[in-house]
């Protein structure tokens, strides 16, 4: 419950963060399909004997090359099978958290028997779409998710429609907390972070707890491309400096290594993405530790990072050709800059430099290599902060960067929302040809 004296706008900010910053086990695109399959299985009369699934091209892109936690296998078919046979239909993005060894074995057997199919939905106008249909003999149940990773819009069985979401908001119904972000500014977000009671935002410390645990697991060197562990090793060999810059990159990329490599630990996600949550969290945590920040100061920095990342991503399609680790790292740059000197000018300069640096990075699907992009984005964020502290930034005379940070963000998001759609189609075409 909110303090009744809390600024209504601040309440909306907090609700937006609570809506967008959630625990997630496994990459969220295959997990979205696993959730659809789990909910469908819960509606089915009898055990699942066969699974059919259809997904949007973008969801297919982000599900082709990523490891599903606990399985050692990559791709959407194993996600759909395990969701149907071992998923918790009530757990949202943690749908696979209770999957047993037997359920994993059964899912692999179903896959080996050719009883699982995943196809691209055609035609499909949705960026994020997943539909799972499970069968027991002639009986079936089908669940459709559209728009958001857990946004179930339809449940039906052979007996008829069980649930359908209304397409439009009922008159008088409260708007989504995210809607307010289209009418706010970074300056207003900073004022909120500086003045909101600590008790109202203490919950954001959970992002540090979850993502630090994931980072520690990644440093074991067992997961993905083990970038974090490799860089740490090179520090010991004297090939990389043992300093704050290295620590930011090592600990952030290690969390992504574990995430993308299939570790059975949840990430605290941001905007429906574990890697975005990691990128918005870990650089801020490392800098906070360096300066000996207490819990309140860490919470305010994390809130600025996560809310700024949501604010920017809210101007983008849910999935696009733009690697959103870059926009999450813009949030991290804001959080780190706030920890060092707290000035709006430093924060805005750091974000502008980020837009001038990494804005062209493409998303070519979720995979172990995401940790490379996460490490690059984290490094760029700290570099941008260091430049801003010296009163240096990419200016409005250069490229897509404008003299005003809000316009710079709008320019970047326009590029991703419009021109990069063709890039997205080309990426999907290339990846589909590899999968044949």
From Swiss-Prot:
Protein's UniProt name? UPF0597 protein YhaM
Task: Please state the gene responsible for encoding this protein.
Answer: yhaM
> What is the source species?
Shigella sonnei (strain Ss046)
**Which superkingdom?**
Bacteria
- Show the Pfam families listed in the entry: SDH_alpha
Give a GO molecular function annotation for the protein.
L-cysteine desulfhydrase activity
Family the entry assigns: Belongs to the UPF0597 family.
A Gene Ontology biological process in which this protein takes part is: L-cysteine catabolic process to pyruvate
Q: Which InterPro entries match?
A: Ser_deHydtase-like_asu, UPF0597
């Amino acid at each position: 419950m909110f303090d009744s004296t809390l600024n209504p706008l601040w309440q909306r900010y907090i609700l937006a963060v609570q809506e967008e910053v959630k625990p997630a086990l496994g990459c969220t695109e295959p997990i979205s399909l696993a959730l659809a399959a789990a909910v469908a299985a819960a509606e089915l009369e009898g055990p699942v004997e066969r699974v059919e699934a259809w997904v949007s091209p973008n969801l297919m892109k982000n599900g082709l090359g990523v490891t599903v936690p606990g399985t050692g296998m990559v791709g959407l078919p194993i996600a759909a099978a395990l969701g149907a046979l071992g998923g918790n239909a009530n757990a949202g993005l943690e749908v696979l958290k209770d999957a047993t060894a037997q359920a994993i074995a059964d899912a692999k057997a179903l896959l080996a028997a050719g009883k699982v199919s995943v196809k691209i939905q055609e035609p499909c106008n949705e960026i994020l779409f997943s539909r799972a249909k499970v069968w027991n003999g002639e009986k079936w149940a089908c669940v459709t998710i559209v728009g958001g990773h857990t946004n179930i819009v339809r449940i039906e069985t052979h007996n008829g429609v069980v649930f359908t979401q209304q397409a439009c908001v009922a008159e008088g119904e409260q708007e989504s907390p995210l809607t307010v972000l289209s009418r706010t500014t970074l300056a207003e977000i900073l004022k909120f972070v500086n003045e909101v009671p600590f008790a109202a935002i203490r919950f954001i410390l959970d992002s540090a707890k979850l993502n630090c645990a994931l980072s520690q697991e990644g440093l074991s060197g067992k997961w993905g491309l083990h970038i974090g562990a490799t860089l740490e090793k090179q520090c010991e060999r004297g090939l990389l400096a043992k300093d704050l810059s290295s620590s930011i990159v090592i600990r952030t990329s290690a969390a992504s290594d574990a995430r993308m490599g299939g570790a059975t630990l949840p990430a605290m996600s941001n905007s429906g993405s574990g890697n975005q949550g990691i990128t918005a969290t870990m650089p801020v945590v490392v800098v906070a530790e360096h300066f000996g920040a207490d819990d309140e100061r860490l919470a305010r920095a994390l809130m600025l990072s996560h809310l700024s990342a949501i604010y920017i991503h809210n101007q983008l399609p849910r999935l696009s050709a733009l690697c959103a680790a870059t926009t999450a790292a813009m949030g991290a740059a804001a959080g780190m800059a706030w920890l060092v000197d707290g000035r709006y000018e430093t924060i805005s300069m750091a974000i502008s430099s980020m837009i001038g640096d990494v804005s062209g990075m493409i998303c070519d699907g979720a995979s172990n290599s995401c940790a490379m992009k996460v490490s690059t984005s984290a490094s760029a964020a700290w570099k941008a902060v260091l430049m801003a502290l010296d009163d240096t930034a990419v200016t409005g005379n250069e490229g897509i960067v404008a003299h005003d940070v809000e316009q710079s963000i709008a320019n970047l998001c326009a590029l991703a929302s419009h021109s990069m759609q063709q890039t997205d189609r080309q990426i999907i075409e290339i990846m589909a040809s590899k999968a044949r």
